[in-house]
Amino acid sequence: MRTLPLGARAFIPVALAGAVLFSLAPSTPAAAATITTEGQQIVQIAKWQLGDPWRYGATGPYAFDCSGLVIYSYKRAGEGAAIRAGSLRSARSIYLYFRSRGKTSRTNPKVGDLVVWGYGSHIGIYIGGGKAISTLRNGVRIHGVFAVTARFTTYIHTGMSTKRVS
């Protein structure tokens, strides 16, 4: 057996250790758990924007206001028609559109439903567990439904929460 001279560096164990670490790494990110509904897909797209800055009127992909994040997430999921993306540009217009069609409720939210605060002054996406994702002044964040300063108004049921991903 050949030994290395004193002070020589051996790179083989380091290379092997690196190979072991890479082989143990998951092939898909843990955050990309199985997505089975359009609502989950919409939430995942919104979560990819976490930390992006707030900018009034911005619709992404690098900055958002509250309705911009909603429109961007729905469009990227292929569901822009669900919120009439383009014709409904503000949180208030989205809220009024769905309210006039009887699609709002203060109970039983589903993942991917919209959350409205202050009668349309702010809007976000329900992610489950009493939490929502929305763009506040400090950027795209996850927060409790009742933690936003504007008063919680309603949930908007867009029908994406149960629509299966094909």
Summary of predicted features, one role per range:
Residues 2-7, 11, 26-27, 31-34, ...:
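Aromatic- and glycine-rich peptidoglycan recognition patches
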Residues 13-23:
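Bacterial N-terminal signal peptides
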Residues 38-42, 46, 66, 70-73:
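Stable alpha-helical elements in mature extracytoplasmic
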Residues 47-51:
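Regular secondary-structure segments
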Residues 52-111, 150-158:
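Catalytic cysteine-centered active-site loop
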